[in-house]
């Protein structure tokens, strides 16, 4: 009875898994499980022992068209009686052959698979041409029947539109829709044997096909009248396109298929010819009537693609024909249909805006591409519905533009010298771009913001000389220049210095310019992890950048210290004097101040003043310069500043009266 308890636990977990539907035939009673398992007569009762664990609703008859599988014992396969005493075998053989084969559910699964097919196939079917049927029988000279395979598809701004639901509640299907002003295209190919073909006439005779051509046309659905299709000419024809003189309302021309050679022999159908076909820039001349008003009056346009053949006797026949789904063409603006639901299609330009369609003119002359037949197939299957791309070539620009505005991009020419690079050892994760020289002044003068600690990733264009500093290496200098010691920046000269993260002295006679927008670090300039950010590579104190003079200062001075930039002059109590009508700079440590009375030599104004290494921090070190701050020049100050004439200092630490002091910088004014 151990085996029965094992099956009871299994039946509790899976009470009805894999079992056929229980019928009310009364074949198996409820006392089957009490029969000893070891008896030979109970061998056919092993399978239905789990019936007692089923629910009552399983005993209801299952009305299905197919008969139950328990009716015949010929399909029953039961284990041998000698194997039933082994627990491992009884637990592994719980279902017989009839329980595994559940055919009533296969139809349901197949239906579900058909319903959940990818939507792309459905969209491609809506945009594809469907074959109407062969008009005539095509044979070769041996009497073998051949079929001409034609595949074509629409390309353009097609979508599915829904009509307003009628009053009776019936659901209307979505229809293929486009706007009349939108251009569309047709591409496809034709495949048939590369042998002479003939048409079987009604009289039983055959006539050889001499020429074939493909045409495209449209027919409206109400009366069957033809609808004009026009080809919109190019305003600027694409490169390598044939020169065609087009009229404004020219209809799409027919595409002649280049015939095969007459001396080609029959190779048993091994060679097939594939002709690419296509029309570009097509447009419906008119729109459909009653768009969305009444379903029974709605007009549709249907495109017809026909393959015409000219026989040896001069007769012209339609060998094959393909049509599209009915198309609704809207003539009004899209805003008039905002209440309608539009479903874009994957295969059209409305569903994939990035789809590239090569346009080489108004049509394509179809030329054959011969293919050898593989041994496992009699005809090649054309699986690609893309447009033919053989007649399109892309020509790139021969010379890169040299204007500064076009150089401000992340794409760099490959002609730059890759050996000269800017390397930043303090940023191991950065990459180095090749450098170049860009002539011309900077068209955008820049002033640093008051809250920004430093400029990052945008060095000012400046001449530099060959040198090597601990923070970086710059190997893009001319070979004829000799290294020189750092020079002290004179206050009478006007020269820019690099930002702190470059730490280079500047000269006025260098021949190289550093491009402003060539960044050696791919991270954003505002990122704290940027290579030139102040938190990583700026070893100097913050605020070393000197900004332009305040609004109450003029641009007559060439260099002003950072301390005098941010703090307006105020009178100290220990100094005993303050600036009045004439502006004076703050006093030194001893509180001395002197009137600025020297000839004026103003440098041209500039936007920002980066620091230089030649600055000194000792107040006693003087240097002769022609700098002056514009003596006896009146400036406006806030009210409350004490106005007194300039007075000489009385303490013992004052400098010589001829020396003008400006914080920790000193120079002689005479």
Curated annotation (Swiss-Prot):
Residues 394-438, 553-568, 611-631 have a biased composition (Polar residues). It is found in: Nucleus; Cytoplasm. Its main location: nucleus. The keyword Nucleotide-binding does not apply. Residues 592-605 have a biased composition (Low complexity). Residues 106-341 bind DNA. InterPro entries: Fungal_trans_regulator (IPR052605), NDT80_DNA-bd_dom (IPR024061), NDT80_DNA-bd_dom_sf (IPR037141), p53-like_TF_DNA-bd_sf (IPR008967). One of its GO terms (cellular component) is cytoplasm. SUPFAM superfamilies: p53-like transcription factors. The keyword ATP-binding does not apply. Pfam families: NDT80_PhoG. Keywords: Cytoplasm, DNA-binding, Nucleus, Transcription, Transcription regulation. One of its GO terms (biological process) is positive regulation of transcription by RNA polymerase II. Residues 394-457, 496-670 are annotated as: Disordered. GO terms for molecular function: DNA binding; DNA-binding transcription factor activity. PROSITE patterns: NDT80. Transcription factor that acts as a positive regulator of nonrepressible acid phosphatase activity. Is a major regulator of responses to nitrogen and carbon starvation and is essential for the expression of genes involved in vegetative incompatibility (like pin-c, het-6, and tol). Vegetative incompatibility is a non-self-recognition system ubiquitous in filamentous fungi which results in programmed cell death. This is Transcription factor vib-1. It comes from Neurospora crassa (strain ATCC 24698 / 74-OR23-1A / CBS 708.71 / DSM 1257 / FGSC 987).
């Amino acid at each position: 009875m151990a085996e029965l308890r094992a099956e009871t636990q299994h039946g509790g977990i899976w009470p009805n898994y894999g079992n056929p539907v229980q019928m009310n035939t009364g074949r198996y009673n409820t006392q089957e499980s009490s029969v000893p398992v070891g008896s030979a007569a109970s061998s056919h009762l092993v399978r239905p022992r789990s019936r007692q664990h089923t629910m009552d609703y399983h005993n209801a008859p299952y009305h299905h068209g197919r008969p139950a599988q328990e009716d015949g014992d010929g399909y029953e396969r039961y284990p041998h009686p000698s194997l039933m005493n082994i627990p491992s075998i009884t637990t592994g053989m719980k279902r017989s052959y009839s329980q595994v084969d559940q055919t009533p559910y296969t139809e349901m699964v197949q239906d579900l698979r058909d319903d959940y097919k990818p939507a792309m196939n459905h969209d491609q079917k809506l945009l594809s041409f469907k074959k109407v049927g062969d008009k005539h029988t095509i044979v070769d000279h041996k009497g073998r029947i051949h079929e001409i395979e034609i595949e074509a598809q629409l390309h353009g701004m097609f979508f599915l539109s829904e009509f307003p639901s009628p009053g009776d509640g019936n659901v209307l299907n979505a229809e293929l829709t486009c706007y009349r002003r939108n251009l569309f295209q047709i591409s496809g190919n034709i495949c048939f044997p590369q042998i002479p073909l003939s048409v079987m006439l009604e009289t039983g005779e055959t006539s050889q096909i001499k020429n074939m051509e493909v045409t495209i046309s449209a027919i409206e659905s109400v009366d069957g009248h033809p609808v004009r299709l026009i080809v919109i000419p190019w305003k600027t024809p694409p490169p390598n396109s044939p020169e065609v003189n087009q009229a404004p309302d020219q209809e799409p021309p027919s595409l002649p298929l280049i015939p095969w050679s007459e001396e080609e022999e029959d190779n048993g159908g091994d060679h097939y010819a594939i002709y690419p076909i296509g029309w570009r820039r097509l447009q419906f001349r008119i729109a459909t009537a009653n768009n969305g008003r009444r379903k029974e009056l709605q007009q549709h346009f249907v495109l017809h693609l026909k393959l015409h053949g000219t026989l040896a006797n001069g007769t012209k026949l339609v060998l094959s024909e393909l049509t599209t789904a009915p198309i609704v063409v809207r003539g009004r603006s899209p805003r008039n249909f905002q209440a309608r639901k539009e479903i874009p299609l994957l295969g059209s330009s409305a569903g994939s805006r990035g789809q590239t369609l090569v346009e080489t003119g108004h049509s394509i002359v179809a030329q054959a591409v011969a293919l050898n037949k593989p041994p496992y197939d009699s005809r090649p299957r054309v699986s690609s519905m893309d447009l033919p791309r053989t007649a399109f070539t892309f020509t790139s620009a021969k010379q890169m533009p040299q204007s500064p505005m076009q150089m401000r991009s992340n794409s760099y020419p490959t002609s730059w010298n890759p050996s000269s690079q800017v390397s930043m050892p303090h940023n191991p994760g950065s990459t180095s771009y090749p450098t170049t020289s860009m002539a011309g002044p900077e068209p955008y003068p820049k002033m640093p913001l008051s809250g920004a600690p430093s400029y990052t990733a945008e060095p000012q264009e400046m001449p530099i000389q060959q040198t090597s500093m601990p923070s970086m290496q710059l190997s893009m200098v001319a070979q004829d220049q000799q290294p020189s010691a750092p020079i002290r920046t004179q206050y009478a000269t006007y020269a820019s210095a690099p930002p702190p993260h470059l730490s280079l002295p500047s000269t006025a006679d260098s021949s190289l310019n550093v491009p402003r927008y060539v960044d050696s670090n791919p991270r954003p300039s505002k990122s704290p992890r940027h290579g030139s950010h102040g938190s990583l590579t700026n070893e100097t104190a913050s605020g070393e950048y000197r900004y332009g003079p305040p609004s109450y200062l003029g641009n007559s001075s060439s260099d002003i210290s950072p301390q005098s930039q941010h703090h307006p002059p105020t009178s100290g109590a220990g100094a005993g004097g303050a600036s009045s009508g004439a502006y004076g700079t703050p006093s030194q440590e001893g509180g001395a101040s002197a009137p600025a009375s020297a000839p004026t030599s103003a440098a041209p104004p500039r936007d920002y003043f980066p620091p230089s290494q030649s600055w000194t921090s000792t107040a006693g070190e003087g240097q002769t310069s022609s700098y002056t701050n514009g003596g006896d020049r009146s400036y406006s100050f806030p009210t409350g500043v004490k106005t007194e004439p300039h007075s000489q200092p009385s303490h013992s630490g004052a400098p010589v009266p001829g020396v003008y002091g400006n914080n920790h910088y000193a120079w002689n004014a005479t």
